[in-house]
């Protein structure tokens, strides 16, 4: 098989690992009621189990910067293998859990281990494809991630239906992880040792993890009362997070080894792409969590039917990812990000006007009509999907190739932080607004009361008020998501243009495939698209920059 074929197999195997990690990011969304029943939490206290979701995301975020940098030192293949093994261990802990504490611990282990899968695969794509053509490849990897979002909720329902208990969702991960490890072993390139391997900034990674962890804890309010958005411990804990963040930046300023080496980094487009990724992540999680809750709380649907409402969004998301990667190679990352987030913002504005009759409502477009719920969710999914590949590509083009591992991790960290904010901050604020709306409706009903009502009439009126308060709360949340998307679109204007990227040089090492056997050079017909780290060229040629800046050869790396 040609080296080009090996390259495609490698990225396919990496995408499979990404899919496995992505499934468990979203799988608990549709089985959370079953989990609540087992751990003894009432259905009207759903905010108490958000650590099951945030624990996974926090582990993902906290570990990812270190794992991204570690992949630059130890190689992509090793980190993916370690991630899959740890993921299997975390799945066993989660499946054996009998209380909320152990369940959250298992989810944190899962998230920490799976933190390697997506960023390292994205970095692998950056290693093997040129800056000019990698956007579509990154879009494909992003589509694998979003396929996890598509399959995850339905996957959970299917396994619970098949095995009659939610633990099966996590037991199934063990053989799947083993299969993926075997495939990765024979598919991904092994990195040869170099004289001076990259060092890992452990202190910086720990400080960043502490800052993020304290932020999540400070935003988590298990008992919203309509008077305080944050819990009683919120402000002190957030102050501690701020101190940890300041310590992180101070350390990064003086440390010899840093999570992101500033040399060669174009910070304006780099930070803009990360901030836009954060906005996209917040909007994504708002949709995944609140659409299903809208179905249960407002439309009165059961868990399975409410989960199926997400299908419109989840199908459009990977389609948008593929289209976005294709478009970015032709019109540039900046324009695609701007268009995608503005489309998503428009969709959220439409969703914010949903009523209790949304299933019957239709958009009147003159010559024809479209169902409101289906159309609005598809618009949001398409818009958020469009930006997945371009945001990653823009971030990687703003840093030297030696930083691709940590830069890929930074993209996903930013997105996951946004997801955490979406479920923690907007969720707490949403329940705060719910209690405010409920109090307002109750006061209005008391003022309008005429003759005394029977107990049944009072209960019916109260149920109506609760439903109206839920509609108003979700309207507020989705409108906030629209604002977040507009902010992300404006930030997208600051990312790199179509032809702006850090100058790339040849890599300092030549990876090999499978069991370490050397790869034959590309055939002459493949030479124009061959990653140069796989070519047997003289060292003096590899160390020289290209004479023509426009001549982008795939896989060129900045010299260390």
From Swiss-Prot:
The chain crosses the membrane at residues 16-36, 48-68, 78-98, 108-128, 143-163, 168-188, 200-220, 229-249, 269-289, 307-327, 336-356, 368-388, 411-431, 477-497. Residues 362-371 are annotated as: Beta-hairpin. The record marks 415 as: Forms salt bridge with Gln-157, probably closes bottom of cavity. This is Triacylglyceride transporter MSMEG_3069/MSMEI_2992. Belongs to the major facilitator superfamily. P55 (TC 2.A.1.3.34) family. InterPro entries: MFS (IPR011701), MFS_dom (IPR020846), MFS_trans_sf (IPR036259), Sugar_transporter_CS (IPR005829). Induction: Part of the lrpG-MSMEG_3069/MSMEI_2992 operon. It comes from Mycolicibacterium smegmatis (strain ATCC 700084 / mc(2)155) (Mycobacterium smegmatis). One of its GO terms (biological process) is lipid transport. Disruption phenotype: Double deletions of lprG-MSMEG_3069/MSMEI_2992 operon are more sensitive to ethidium bromide; restoration of wild-type growth is conferred by the M.tuberculosis operon. Cells display abnormal colony morphology and are defective for sliding motility under carbon-limiting conditions. A double lprG-MSMEG_3069/MSMEI_2992 deletion strain is more sensitive to the antibiotics tetracyline, vancomycin, rifabutin and novobiocin, has a higher mean surface rigidity, and has a cell separation defect. Keywords: Antibiotic resistance, Cell inner membrane, Cell membrane, Lipid transport, Lipid-binding, Membrane, Transmembrane, Transmembrane helix, Transport. It is a multi-pass membrane protein. The keyword Transport applies. In association with lipoprotein LprG transports triacyglycerides (TAG) across the inner cell membrane into the periplasm; TAG probably regulates lipid metabolism and growth regulation and plays a structural role in the outer membrane. TAG (and maybe other lipids) enters the central cavity of the P55 transporter from within the cell inner membrane via clefts on the cytoplasmic face of P55 between TM5-TM8 and TM2-TM11. From there the lipid is probably transferred to the hydrophobic cavity of LprG. It is found in: Cell inner membrane. One of its GO terms (molecular function) is lipid binding. Resistance to ethidium bromide is inhibited by reserpine. Its main location: membrane.
């Amino acid at each position: 098989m040609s080296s080009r074929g090996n390259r495609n197999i490698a990225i396919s195997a990496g995408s499979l690992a990404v899919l496995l990690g992505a499934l468990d990011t979203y799988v608990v969304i549709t089985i959370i009621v079953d989990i609540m029943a087992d751990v003894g939490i009432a259905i009207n206290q759903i905010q108490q189990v958000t650590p099951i979701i945030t624990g996974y995301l926090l582990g993902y975020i906290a570990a990812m910067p270190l794992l991204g940098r570690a992949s630059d030192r130890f190689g992509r293949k090793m980190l993916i293998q370690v991630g899959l093994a740890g993921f299997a261990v975390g799945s066993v802990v989660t499946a054996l859990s009998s209380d909320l504490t152990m369940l959250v611990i298992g989810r944190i282990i899962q998230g920490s281990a799976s933190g390697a899968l997506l960023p390292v695969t994205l970095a692998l794509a950056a290693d093997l494809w040129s800056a000019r053509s990698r956007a579509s490849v990154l879009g494909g990897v992003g589509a694998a991630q979003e396929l996890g979002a598509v399959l995850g909720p339905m996957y959970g329902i299917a396994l619970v239906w098949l095995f009659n208990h939610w633990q099966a969702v996590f037991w199934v991960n063990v053989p799947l992880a083993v299969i993926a490890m075997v495939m990765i072993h024979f598919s991904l390139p092994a990195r040869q040792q170099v004289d001076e391997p990259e060092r890992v900034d452990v202190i910086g990674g720990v400080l960043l993890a502490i800052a993020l962890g304290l932020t999540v804890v400070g935003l988590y309010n298990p008992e919203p009362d309509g008077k305080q958005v944050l819990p009683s411990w919120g402000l002190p804990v957030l102050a501690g997070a701020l101190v940890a963040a300041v310590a992180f930046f101070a350390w990064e300023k003086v440390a010899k080894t840093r999570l992101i080496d500033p040399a060669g980094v174009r910070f304006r487009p780099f930070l803009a792409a990360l901030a836009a990724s954060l906005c996209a992540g917040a909007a994504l999680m708002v949709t995944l969590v609140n659409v299903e809750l809208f179905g249960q709380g407002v439309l009165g649907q059961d868990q399975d039917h409410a989960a199926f409402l997400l299908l419109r969004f989840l199908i459009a998301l990977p389609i948008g990812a593929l289209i976005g990667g294709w478009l970015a190679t032709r019109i540039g990352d900046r324009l695609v990000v701007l268009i995608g987030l503005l489309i998503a913002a428009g969709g959220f504005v439409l969703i914010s006007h949903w009523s209790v009759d949304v299933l019957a409502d239709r958009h009147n477009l003159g010559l024809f009509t479209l169902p409101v719920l289906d159309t609005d969710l598809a618009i949001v999914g398409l818009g958020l999907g469009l930006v997945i590949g371009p945001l990653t590509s823009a971030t990687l083009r703003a840093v030297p190739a030696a930083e691709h591992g940590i830069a890929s991790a930074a993209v996903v960290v930013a997105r996951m932080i946004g997801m955490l904010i979406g479920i923690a901050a907007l969720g707490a604020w949403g329940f705060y607004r719910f209690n405010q709306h409920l109090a307002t409706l109750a006061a209005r009903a008391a003022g309008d009361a005429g003759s005394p009502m029977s107990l049944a009439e009072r209960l019916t009126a109260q149920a109506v008020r609760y439903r109206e308060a839920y509609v108003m709360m979700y309207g507020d949340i989705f409108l906030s998501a629209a604002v977040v998307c507009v902010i992300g679109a404006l930030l997208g204007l600051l990312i790199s243009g179509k032809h702006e990227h850090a100058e790339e040089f040849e890599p300092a090492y030549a990876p090999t495939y499978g069991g370490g056997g050397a790869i034959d050079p590309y055939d002459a017909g493949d030479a124009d698209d061959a990653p140069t780290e796989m070519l047997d060229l003289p060292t003096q040629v590899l160390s020289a920059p290209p004479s023509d800046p426009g001549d982008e050869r795939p896989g060129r790396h900045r010299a260390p």
